[in-house]
């Protein structure tokens, strides 16, 4: 009886044939819920009662479904998709997405989670039949933090092809498996697009047929490549075209007409900016001074392959992937770079393809399937292990624990945890046998080209032991950053074609011509974000009070769960204050991201992005060849979001994550006043120019001196922002008016600065 009631509830909500307006549907739903609740009183088992009530709540939280859509011949579709407002379900694990879409068919199950209406992230081919949502939730959590540097918030999708195991058992080759994965991928994307709004040529939002909506317009859906789907972007864009979706080939970035991450090497190059900063702050130039590296990955992969070619001073002594273990105890940087480059260009290469004559004495390539591996004296010395014979798992553990200068993650898997975490909590069963604790690592620096190489607690344990590390979200943000630039550029170019400012035939050549500039814009974000973390690290334990207040403020708003994010509670913070122990870089990275995300929301809902001064901010966001389309640019559908993203990043990068809320409280101003004051202060005192001059001193002066100069500029900027927000910004104020009022005096003061300040 109860199940029939649930089906009736679903039909009352979503069957188009039921007719009636929204109010009458809501009334019918209310009556059915009351009736079901009465029926539930008769359920004898507490467990059954709880399960049924959760199902009622689930149906109530569904906002759309394709269940009542049909194909051209009138048949029901062979797949079902439902869209759920996850935050309406009390029992879901944290963090709860804004929306999730579940897609089911006999041959595939998948889920797409996103944290806001404008969200982006990859779709992965999952091999975790029973807990792919857990996998995707962990990934989207990292994606949400990573996306602080771009316009959309985080999203992630994962699909499990259910017939794949049978194909493998039947002896199906790689091509047969790939074909089945593509079939599942197509169904998954169709399920997502079935219930997503569209935008017509007039700019009006249109809705899918036979879909009853219990929410507002929702037309923004973009996807990206991920594990197992690196070559699927053109397939996705073909499906987008079949649906007439407004984003066309901006739907899936990185296709044949787009910015290919592997060709650009953008993810690895971004991670390398982080690695270079770590070493630069240790006084070492890794582009010219040889340094030892161990890693996870192989040269055929995007992130590892590109990464291990970014310096000709690399001495890669050991690495492993899912097939082989590579050890070169004393590599020659020049010849080993040439060999890695050859392997990178070799299709589907593995470590077994490495020219053994190029490996130094005692080294070799060993299959992970071997029963045991005999170790040479050279291997024992470079990895600092005593055994003469070990199994592959022990050898891989030794590589992770090796006393190398850099440990670089470029492959799939979670290899480092904290002592208090269990392998089950980590959720990566395949690597349980080789996982180590963060405090045991002996590398000086960790570069996270890959996602989830360490747990957050593992990162913190490594940092507390003196290691230099950020987070995967900081280190490998360049891929998603590049994709976001591509989407926003394609939206602009589409508008330029529609307005007649650009010919359709010129589109693809224009996109290709901007590849290098897009790459440089993305890498600037990696440089700036890692610098922001370094400046906060320099603040030390003295910043703990303001950081604690910021976390309390976010927690009170329901925006931050410290336990979920691995941030210390008040008791642990008190202990750190007593010990003079500051937050670690991984913790600071999380605070930085939360500050940017929160500030973005505040700015985009304020009047600040509409200030005329920020028209040029928008123009500078795009590559130079697009400046001629400024009229279309100012009508860009995401204009305010792009400007708000730029401003939230600049404010937090230059002034710190706790600054925005402290400034608003102390100056008693709103967000718009703070933003205008910040931008005016930067321009009045020409602080951007000063900041860039300090950045130009990389490796020319000691890192400590460089940091001190940045801190001086930041202090001036914070003080002048406060003064302007408190004293000068009034209703109707503009950035240009503030600059005109105060810059002449500031320039005059600069001209005689030495004599005045002495």
Predicted regions and their residues:
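Extended, well-ordered protein cores
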Residues: 1-224, 233-238, 250-257
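Non-transmembrane, aqueous-exposed alpha-helical and coiled segments at domain scale
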Residues: 167-172, 181-182, 186, 193-218, ...
């Amino acid at each position: 009886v109860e199940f029939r009631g649930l089906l009736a509830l679903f039909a009352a909500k979503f069957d188009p044939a039921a007719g009636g307006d929204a109010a009458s549907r809501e009334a019918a739903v209310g009556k059915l819920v009351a009736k079901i609740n009465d029926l539930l009183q008769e359920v004898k088992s507490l467990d059954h009662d709880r399960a049924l009530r959760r199902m009622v709540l689930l149906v109530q939280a569904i906002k759309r479904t394709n269940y009542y859509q049909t194909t051209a011949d009138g048949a029901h579709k062979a797949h079902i998709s439902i869209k759920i407002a996850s935050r309406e379900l009390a029992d879901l694990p944290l963090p709860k997405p804004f929306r999730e879409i579940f897609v089911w068919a006999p041959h595939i199950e998948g889920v797409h989670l996103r944290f806001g209406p404008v969200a982006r992230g990859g779709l992965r081919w999952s091999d975790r039949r029973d807990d792919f949502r857990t996998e995707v939730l962990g990934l989207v959590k990292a994606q949400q933090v990573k996306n602080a540097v771009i316009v959309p918030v985080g999203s992630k999708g994962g699909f499990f092809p259910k017939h794949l195991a049978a194909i493998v058992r039947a002896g199906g080759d790689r091509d047969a498996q790939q074909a089945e994965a593509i079939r599942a991928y197509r169904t998954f994307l169709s399920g997502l697009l079935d219930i997503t709004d569209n935008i017509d040529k007039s700019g009006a939002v249109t809705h899918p047929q036979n879909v009853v909506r219990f929410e507002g317009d929702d037309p923004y859906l973009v996807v990206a490549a991920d594990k197992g789907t690196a070559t699927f972007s053109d397939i996705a864009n073909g499906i987008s075209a079949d649906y007439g979706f407004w984003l066309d080939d901006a739907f899936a970035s990185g296709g044949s007409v787009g910015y290919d991450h592997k060709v650009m090497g953008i993810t690895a190059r971004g991670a390398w900016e982080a690695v270079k900063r770590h070493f630069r702050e240790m006084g070492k130039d890794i582009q010219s001074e040889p340094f030892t590296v161990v890693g996870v990955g192989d040269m055929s992969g995007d992130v590892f392959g590109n990464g291990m070619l970014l310096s000709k001073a690399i001495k890669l002594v050991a690495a492993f992937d899912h097939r082989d273990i590579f050890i070169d105890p004393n590599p020659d940087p020049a010849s080993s770079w040439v060999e890695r480059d050859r392997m990178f260009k070799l299709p589907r290469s593995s470590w077994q393809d490495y020219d053994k004559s190029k490996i130094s004495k005692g080294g070799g390539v060993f299959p992970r399937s071997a029963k045991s591996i005999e170790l040479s004296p050279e291997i024992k010395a470079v990895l600092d292990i005593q055994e003469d014979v070990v199994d592959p798992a022990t050898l891989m553990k030794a590589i992770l624990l090796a006393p190398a200068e850099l440990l670089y993650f470029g492959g799939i898997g979670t290899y480092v945890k904290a002592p208090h975490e269990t392998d089950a909590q980590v959720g990566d069963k395949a690597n349980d046998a080789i996982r180590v604790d963060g405090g045991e690592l002996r590398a000086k620096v960790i570069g996270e080209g890959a996602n989830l190489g360490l747990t957050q607690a593992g990162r913190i344990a490594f940092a507390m032991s003196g290691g230099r590390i950020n987070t995967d979200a900081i280190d490998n943000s360049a891929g998603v950053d590049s994709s976001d630039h591509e989407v926003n550029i394609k939206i602009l170019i589409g508008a330029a074609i529609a307005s007649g400012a650009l010919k359709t035939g010129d589109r693809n050549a224009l996109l290709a011509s901007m590849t290098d500039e897009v790459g440089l814009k993305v890498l600037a974000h990696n440089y700036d974000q890692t610098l922001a973390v370094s400046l906060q690290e320099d603040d030390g334990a003295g910043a703990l009070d303001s950081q604690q207040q910021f976390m309390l403020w976010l927690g009170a708003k329901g925006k931050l769960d410290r336990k979920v994010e691995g941030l210390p509670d008040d008791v642990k913070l008190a202990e750190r204050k007593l010990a003079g122990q500051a937050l670690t870089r991984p913790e600071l990275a999380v605070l930085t991201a939360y500050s940017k995300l929160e500030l973005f929301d505040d700015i985009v809902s304020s009047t600040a992005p509409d200030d005329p001064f920020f028209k040029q901010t928008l123009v500078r966001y795009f590559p130079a060849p697009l400046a001629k389309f400024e009229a279309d640019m100012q009508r860009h559908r995401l204009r305010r979001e792009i400007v708000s993203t730029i401003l939230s990043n600049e404010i937090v990068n230059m002034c710190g994550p706790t600054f925005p809320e402290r400034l608003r409280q102390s100056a008693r101003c709103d967000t718009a006043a703070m933003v205008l004051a910040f931008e005016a202060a930067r321009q009045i005192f020409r602080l951007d120019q000063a900041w860039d001059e300090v950045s130009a001193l990389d490796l020319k002066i000691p890192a400590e001196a460089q940091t001190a100069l940045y801190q001086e500029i930041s202090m001036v900027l914070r003080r002048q922002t406060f003064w302007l927000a408190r004293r000068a910004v009034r209703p109707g104020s503009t950035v240009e008016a503030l600059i005109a009022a105060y810059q002449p005096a500031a320039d005059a003061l600069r001209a005689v600065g030495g004599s005045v300040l002495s």
